[in-house]
Regions:
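Alpha/beta-hydrolase active-site loop
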Residues: 79-99
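N-terminal cap/lid segment of alpha/beta-hydrolase-fold proteins
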Residues: 1-23
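Active-site glycine-rich loops that stabilize anionic/oxyanionic intermediates
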Residues: 31, 35-39, 113, 248
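Catalytic active-site module of serine/aspartate enzymes centered on a nucleophile-bearing elbow/loop
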Residues: 268-309
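Conserved alpha/beta-hydrolase
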Residues: 43, 48-74
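Alpha/beta-hydrolase-fold enzymes
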Residues: 121-207
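Alpha/beta-hydrolase fold nucleophile elbow
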Residues: 102-113
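Short beta-strand/loop motif that positions the catalytic acidic residue
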Residues: 244-246
Length: 309
């Protein structure tokens, strides 16, 4: 296996950081990964190693305001203006780079949590640039009222604190609800994984667990509003294979809302949607005690849909 880290220049001349894991030979397929909120791409090194062993390369970018990319901006902040679209453009830039390096190899896009919402929005614009989709710990809420209410709170906090302000109220309203599902509460991050070692690693990582800015929350909530309607999902190629997976004990989607997301894609016309719910797992199946099983399922799904098996 080989690992390298490099920088790419985005459409607005900002630079973003990329981690790349690959087999020693030319890979049979490529995965481009979009991580979640308040984490970074290096956390997926174990996935990169497993994929490389299976002959698959992994490219994972640090989102704006995250990981090493944050050195060119504000931590936990996509941008003052149009930040969500700028991140989508970064993903497209990485896709161009992959195409230049690997030409006709099949490319799969992987999004975890917040990254899964970005991936769905990316597909609304650039679905022809990938051959398959993997959504980890995503969510689907049809209630426009809930989004509007959350946006009102976020906009009030932006007015009060500024675009780069950090709202402890927003952070508490969203993450305290996740944490309440688990007792006794040993850390503030118990909802991420049942593996205490992995939770401790997250808590001790200086690039994880920070409070995002009010503007990032507005960007994310606005993006969620756009990707939810079935009338928008029909714009995505209905022949695109999609794998949706998560832990049954994830307080974000609670299991059933992953099924709702799969059904939304099916209702939009896609008949190539697979769903996997893992018992006893929480928000980060890739960082659970039985994560090798999850990773093997991903590898088998990629090989099947890339016609490598």
């Amino acid at each position: 296996m080989r690992h390298e880290a490099f920088w790419l220049t985005a459409s607005d001349s900002t630079e973003f950081h990329v981690n790349h894991w690959s087999p020693t030979q030319e890979p049979q397929a490529i995965v481009m990964l979009v991580h979640g909120m308040a984490e970074h791409s290096k956390r997926y090194a174990h996935l990169g190693a497993a994929l490389a062993k299976a002959g698959i390369a992994l490219y994972a970018l640090d989102l704006r305001g995250h990981g090493f990319t944050a050195s060119f901006g504000v931590k936990g902040h996509f941008g003052n203006h149009n930040g969500w679209q700028l991140v989508l453009d970064d993903i497209r830039c990485l896709n161009h780079h992959i195409r230049q390096q690997h030409h006709e190899k099949p490319v799969f896009i992987f999004g975890h949590s917040l990254g899964s919402y970005l991936v769905i929005d990316y597909l609304l614009q650039y679905c022809c640039s990938v051959q398959g989709v993997i959504l980890s710990s995503s969510n689907y809420i049809q209630s426009t009222f809930r989004y509007k209410l959350a946006l009102q709170v976020a906009r009030f906090e932006r007015w009060r604190l500024g675009k780069q302000g950090r709202s402890k109220l927003l952070h508490w309203l969203i993450f305290n609800r996740h944490q309440r599902a688990f007792k006794p509460q040993k850390t503030l991050h118990d909802w991420l994984s049942s593996d205490e070692k992995q939770v401790k690693l997250y808590a001790q990582d200086p690039l994880c667990g920070f409070i995002s800015t009010t503007q990032l929350w507005i960007d994310a909530l606005t993006g969620l509003q756009r990707i939810t309607p079935i009338s928008n999902l029909v714009q995505i190629d209905n022949l695109l294979p999609i794998l949706i997976f998560g832990g049954e004990h994830d307080p974000i989607h609670q299991g059933h809302r992953l099924i709702d997301l799969a059904n939304a894609f099916r209702e939009s016309g896609n008949r190539f949607v697979d769903v996997k719910l893992y018992p006893d797992m929480r928000h980060e199946p890739l960082n659970e005690k039985n994560s090798p099983r999850v990773i093997q399922d991903i590898i088998e799904w990629i090989k099947h849909n890339a016609r490598l098996d």
